[in-house]
C-alpha cells in the first residue's frame, strides 16, 4: 500500500503516521529522515543537498525530488509499500512525484487528509508555555501547570497566536492545490482530526482497510 498523509501543523499527522506504520508495516518516509539518510550515505542528491544546507540556502525542488526518487527506488518500497509524510509540499512537487511513481512503476493508493478546524489548531499550537526556571513545557488548556503564575512562564515567538495563524495560512495556501490535484484522481480520504487520538486512528484504519 502506497500512501500520502496530509494535514496542517498541529493536526496530529505525525502521531497518526507512526500508528499507520506500526499497524500496516509500511515504510515511513519523512522528509527530514530522507535528507539525513541521503547526506549520511553521501548519495549524489545527499551531497547536493548538503552543499545548499551548508551555505544556509533553501534546498531547491529538483534536489528534494531527487532525494525522494532515490528513496522510493530502494528495495524495501516494492516489498512493503510507503507512507510519505511531509512531501509533497507544493503542487510542483506533487507533479514531480506523479512522474517519479510512473517512472518507478509504482502507484499511489490513497491520500489521508487529517482535517482540523484552523481555529482549533491556533488554540492547540499557541497554548504552549515554558517555565522560565526549569524549561519545562506546559499547555495553558490541555496540560496546565499546577501552580501557574503568569510571571513564571514565557511563550516562544513562534508559538504566539498571530505567528501560528500566519504559519497555518501559508500551509493552507500550499496544501489546497495539492489536495485538489489528488481529489480529482479520487485518492483523498478526509479524516476528522478533532477527536481523541484513538478515534482518529480508528477512522484512518477503516479507510485504509477499504483500500487494501
Swiss-Prot record:
Return the annotated region ranges for NMP.
30-59
Q: Please give the catalytic activity noted in the UniProt record.
A: AMP + ATP = 2 ADP
Q: Which residues bind ATP?
A: 10-15, 128, 137-138, 195
Pathway(s) per entry:
Purine metabolism; AMP biosynthesis via salvage pathway; AMP from ADP: step 1/1
A GO CC annotation given for this chain: cytoplasm
The listed locations are: Cytoplasm
Keyword Nucleotide-binding annotated: yes
Q: What class of enzyme is it?
A: transferase
Q: Name one GO molecular function term.
A: ATP binding
* Region (LID), start-end ranges: 127-159
Q: Which residues fall in a coiled-coil region?
A: none
Keywords recorded for this protein, A-Z = ATP-binding, Cytoplasm, Kinase, Nucleotide biosynthesis, Nucleotide-binding, Transferase
In this chain, AMP is annotated as bound at 31, 36, 57-59, 86-89, 93, 156, 167
UniProt main location, coarse: cytoplasm
Q: Where are the transmembrane segments?
A: none
Query: What note about domains is in the entry?
Result: Consists of three domains, a large central CORE domain and two small peripheral domains, NMPbind and LID, which undergo movements during catalysis. The LID domain closes over the site of phosphoryl transfer upon ATP binding. Assembling and dissambling the active center during each catalytic cycle provides an effective means to prevent ATP hydrolysis.
How this chain assembles, per its entry, is: Monomer.
Q: Which family does it belong to?
A: Belongs to the adenylate kinase family.
Q: What is this protein called?
A: Adenylate kinase
Q: Which organism is it from?
A: Streptococcus pyogenes serotype M1
Its taxonomic placement starts with: Bacteria, Bacillati, Bacillota, Bacilli, Lactobacillales
Amino acid at each position: 500500500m502506497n500512501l500520502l498523509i496530509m494535514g496542517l501543523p498541529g493536526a496530529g499527522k505525525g502521531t497518526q503516521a507512526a500508528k499507520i506504520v506500526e499497524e500496516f508495516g509500511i515504510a515511513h518516509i519523512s522528509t527530514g529522515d530522507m535528507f539525513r539518510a541521503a547526506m549520511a550515505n553521501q548519495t549524489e542528491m545527499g551531497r547536493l543537498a548538503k552543499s545548499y544546507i551548508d551555505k544556509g540556502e533553501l534546498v531547491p525542488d529538483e534536489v528534494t525530488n531527487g532525494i525522494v526518487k532515490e528513496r522510493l527506488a530502494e528495495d524495501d518500497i516494492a516489498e512493503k509499500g510507503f507512507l510519505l509524510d511531509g512531501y509533497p509540499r507544493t503542487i510542483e512537487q506533487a507533479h514531480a512525484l506523479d512522474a517519479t511513481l510512473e517512472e518507478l512503476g509504482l502507484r499511489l493508493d490513497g491520500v489521508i487528509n487529517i482535517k482540523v478546524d484552523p481555529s482549533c489548531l491556533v488554540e492547540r499550537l499557541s497554548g504552549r508555555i515554558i517555565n522560565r526556571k526549569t524549561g519545562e513545557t506546559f499547555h495553558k488548556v490541555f496540560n496546565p501547570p499546577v501552580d501557574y503564575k503568569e510571571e513564571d512562564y514565557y511563550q516562544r515567538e513562534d508559538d504566539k497566536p498571530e505567528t501560528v495563524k500566519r504559519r497555518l495560512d501559508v500551509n493552507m495556501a500550499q496544501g489546497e492545490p495539492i489536495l485538489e490535484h489528488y481529489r480529482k484522481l479520487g485518492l483523498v480520504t478526509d479524516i476528522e482530526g478533532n477527536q481523541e487520538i484513538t478515534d482518529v486512528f480508528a477512522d484512518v484504519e477503516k479507510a485504509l482497510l477499504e483500500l487494501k
